[in-house]
Every structure is written in structure tokens, then in C-alpha cells.
Regions:
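Pyridoxal 5′-phosphate
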Residues: 1-463
Length: 463
């Protein structure tokens, strides 16, 4: 029996004006819907970014008034860093911003050439998508490092953490892993892998948290990550990527020298010099930057970035923090980080309930196969047999994935297609040997039981 008593889905649906077009959107894995507060914030940010910021009086020795001529757009950069820091349990000065996590991981891999030389190793995993695989493969090939692979359990899609005790060695320079697979939904024991990495090497542990960001309370320290990557779009925000570093000390270690001056000038145009750094007594002073942070931004924050888009980052994290209500139906109170901790588990439980309905329904349809939830002899696994996020993929015997997708679309249900070459994990699991692809169902907090029933009726009509 599906129980949503602790999550006010009608209220949450009202936060998405895009749902009024009549479509059932189950493609959150690739194209999440934007809440109205995010689109409104972006619109206001584009209008206000070039305007001069008002001059406020200076109060106290540890603060400084804005300089004359400061634009409002510069505050959007600062608020975006603060929002990402709240989302992952970090400090704003540890946040690097870019156009996407793919671009940022690319830049990170290129900038670590001194670590990826001959004799060093890079450890990658099959559960990651291309954003956290391809940049490291290119960098390893260019600079001479060897690549080692962590393999998934091909029956479930889970990435076992125990294998890293053999894969990681003193020569390991980088270990990159996804916190969850975006198509199958299986969650990786990142903390266990992180403990192994730090115990056996001085390698950098890079975690792609993109798939778990809409559902899990992320804490970079608990995960043991040195660098954490995500796209704000995955939580219903604008197309902005972020890298979050564990500490300023790590930033200084990874970037001991500034890049070429031309890169420094490009980064300066993005406003890298305007943020927070330790002041007298360890307190923060506005307008200054720790040298290690500045060097990291000069290396990674290349080119310009729309301050209008940055204006929607804080609204996206606020939306995530305000999804759930307390027992009386009132919004949760406290800091944004506290509201994330209190509300996200309730939202995740609700979406898990919908995902269980989808899995149970597909298991009851002849010829339907839910990837990672069936054994060798087509016995069905329980949805909760492994830790997962509410994402799943399936295929139908004898029916091309494009045809399934088209039938769903004709019935008003929007899903995603995973073609051959788009998923290393599905390739290893043999999905593309028996099918032309798979259909990915990306559930979100705005979906309903009615949406699930509509999906299942459309799939059933194919047989």
C-alpha cells in the first residue's frame, strides 16, 4: 500500500507551473522540471545583474562595505557559492563554478598533469557516466598514467567497495567514482571506498554526486571525498556545474602555482577575486580571497559565466530545502542546511514509493525486464534488496526502446531512451546485446500515483 501521508505532493506540484501542459514528465534523469521560483529568480537575476549595487554602511571591524561601482550580478556569484556549500556541507570558498560538471571535471583532469605522469594510476568505475570517465581517460592517455577499472556486480549494477583494496596502491593518483548510477539507480558505498583510498594512497578521491543530489543529504566530509562534482540542473536549477573541494589546504596542494596569465585574466572576468578569506583572528573578511582559492579559480573557472543563471542557484537549493512539511503541515524551519536534512529524506521516501509501484507493475507485465532487478533465470529481486535512488530502466522483449518511448509519448508520458554507447554499465550488463536500448524512468517529487498508472497502462498496451 502506497503511503504519502508525510509528504504533501499536491503542494509540491503547485511549485511547478510547467506541469499545467498536461504531460506526465518521468524524465528527471535527463531533463528535470524547473520550479517556478527558479525560473523567476533567473529572470530577476538577468534584469538586475548589470545594475549598481546599493552602498551599505560599514558595521564592525570584520566587515567591509561594497566598493563603489559594484554590480548586483557579483552578489549572484557569492550567493551561488553559499547555496552549493549548504547543499553539500562545505564552505563557500571551497566551491568552484562552471558551465557544467563535465567542463569542470575536464578542466580538473587537465590541470592535474603533474599527478598523472608515467608510473601513476587512475582508478575509474563502470557505474559512472561519461562526465566522470572520459576526462580522466584522455588525461591518462595524454600524460602517461595507467587506468584501472572497478567492475560492477552485473546482476544488480552495484559497485562493490571491497575491490578497491586491490585496485588502490601507493601509485594511485586519482580515484573517480559516482555516488549512484543515473540509469539503474544503485548507490555506491562511497565512504568505504574513500577510507580505502586515503589509507592506501595519496590519491585524489573525486566523487560525482550528480545522481544522488535530488534525493540524498550530501556531506562531503562523511563521504570522504576530496572533490565533489554535480550539476545544479539535476535538482531543477539552471545549467551550472560545481566542483567542491574538501579544504583550502587541498586546493593549495593541487594548485601550487598559478596558470598562464592569459588564464588568470579569463578567470578574473568571472569574478574570482571577489569572495571570502580568513581575516584577523580567523574571521572572514569580505572582498579578499585566500591565495590557494584564487589559484584554483584561475585554473578552473575559465571564461565567462552568466550571472543571470547563477541567480537561480540559490533558489534551486531553497526549493529542495522546502519540499517537505512538518507534522502540522507547516514549512520546516531553521537554516537551509537544517531544512535539507529534515526534508530530503521525506521527499526521497515518497519518490521511492512511486518507484516500487513502477517496478511491481513492470514485473507483472510479460516480456518486461527491469534492469538490475532480475536474476539470471528471470527471478525478480526486491526493490529494496540494495540501496538505491528512485531511478530505473527497463526494456521489452522484441520491442525496440525507441518504439516503447514513442508509445509512451503518444500516451502523454515523457521518458528517456538510453541508446547503445550511452551507458558503460548497461553495456557490461549485456543490455544492448538483447535490446536496441533501454527506457529510463526518472521519477521526481512532482510525480503521482496517477502518473505511474498511466505509464504502466501505456507499457501494457505494447503486448
Amino acid at each position: 500500500m502506497f503511503d504519502n501521508a508525510r509528504f504533501d505532493n499536491p503542494r509540491v506540484r503547485g511549485l511547478y507551473t510547467s506541469l499545467s501542459d498536461g504531460w506526465v514528465y518521468m524524465n528527471a534523469a535527463t531533463d528535470p522540471q524547473l520550479p517556478e521560483r527558479v525560473s523567476g529568480a533567473v529572470s530577476r537575476a538577468f534584469r538586475s545583474a548589470p545594475l549598481a549595487a546599493p552602498i551599505e554602511e560599514n558595521h564592525g571591524e570584520h566587515s567591509r562595505a561594497a566598493s563603489p561601482g559594484t554590480r548586483i550580478g557579483e552578489s549572484h556569484i557569492k550567493s551561488a557559492r553559499v547555496a552549493i556549500a549548504d547543499l553539500v556541507g562545505a564552505r563557500p570558498e571551497h566551491v568552484i563554478l562552471g558551465s557544467s560538471r563535465t567542463q569542470l571535471i575536464n578542466q580538473l583532469a587537465e590541470s592535474l598533469s603533474h599527478r598523472l605522469r608515467l608510473g601513476r594510476q587512475v582508478v575509474l568505475s563502470r557505474v559512472d557516466d561519461g562526465a566522470n570517465i572520459d576526462p580522466w581517460l584522455r588525461a591518462a592517455d595524454l600524460y602517461g598514467a595507467d587506468v584501472r577499472w572497478a567492475e560492477a556486480d552485473l546482476s544488480t549494477g552495484v559497485l562493490p567497495a571491497w575491490q578497491y583494496t586491490e585496485l588502490v596502491s601507493p601509485e594511485t593518483a586519482v580515484v573517480a567514482v559516482a555516488a549512484a548510477n543515473e540509469h539503474v539507480g544503485t548507490v555506491t558505498d562511497v565512504a568505504a571506498i574513500g577510507r580505502t583510498v586515503h589509507a592506501k594512497s595519496d590519491g585524489i578521491f573525486v566523487v560525482d554526486a550528480n545522481a544522488v543530489a535530488p534525493f540524498h543529504v550530501i556531506d562531503i566530509a562523511d563521504l570522504g571525498a576530496d572533490v565533489l562534482a554535480l550539476d545544479v540542473a539535476t535538482i531543477g536549477g539552471p545549467s551550472i556545474g560545481a566542483l567542491v573541494f574538501r579544504s583550502v589546504e587541498l586546493m593549495g596542494e593541487l594548485f601550487p602555482h598559478p596558470p598562464r596569465q592569459s588564464r588568470a585574466r579569463a578567470a578574473a572576468r568571472f569574478g574570482a577575486h571577489k569572495d571570502v578569506a580568513p581575516g584577523p583572528g580567523g574571521l572572514a573578511l569580505r572582498g579578499a580571497v585566500h591565495p590557494s582559492v584564487e589559484r584554483a579559480r584561475e585554473w578552473l573557472e575559465l571564461g565567462g559565466l552568466s550571472e543571470g543563471l547563477l541567480g537561480g542557484v540559490s533558489a534551486a537549493v531553497d526549493h529542495l530545502a522546502d519540499l517537505a512539511s512538518d507534522a502540522e503541515g507547516d514549512s520546516l524551519r531553521g537554516t537551509r542546511r537544517r531544512r535539507l536534512r529534515g526534508g530530503l529524506p521525506l521527499a526521497e521516501d515518497y519518490v521511492h514509493g512511486l518507484a516500487r509501484m513502477v517496478v511491481d507493475g513492470l514485473h507483472g507485465l510479460p516480456g518486461a525486464h527491469v534492469i538490475g532487478l532480475e536474476g539470471e533465470y528471470e527471478e525478480h529481486f526486491d526493490y529494496d534488496s540494495v540501496e538505491r535512488i528512485p531511478r530505473l530502466s527497463f526494456f521489452i522483449d522484441g520491442v525496440p526502446a525507441e518504439a516503447v518511448h514513442a508509445r509512451l509519448f503518444a500516451q502523454g508520458v515523457v521518458t528517456s531512451v538510453i541508446p547503445p554507447g550511452d551507458s558503460e554499465l548497461l553495456e557490461q550488463m549485456g543490455v544492448f546485446e538483447s535490446s536496441t536500448g533501454a527506457v529510463c524512468v526518472g521519477l521526481s517529487v512532482h510525480n503521482t500515483v496517477g502518473d505511474v498508472n498511466r505509464l504502466l497502462r501505456a507499457v501494457a498496451s505494447l503486448r
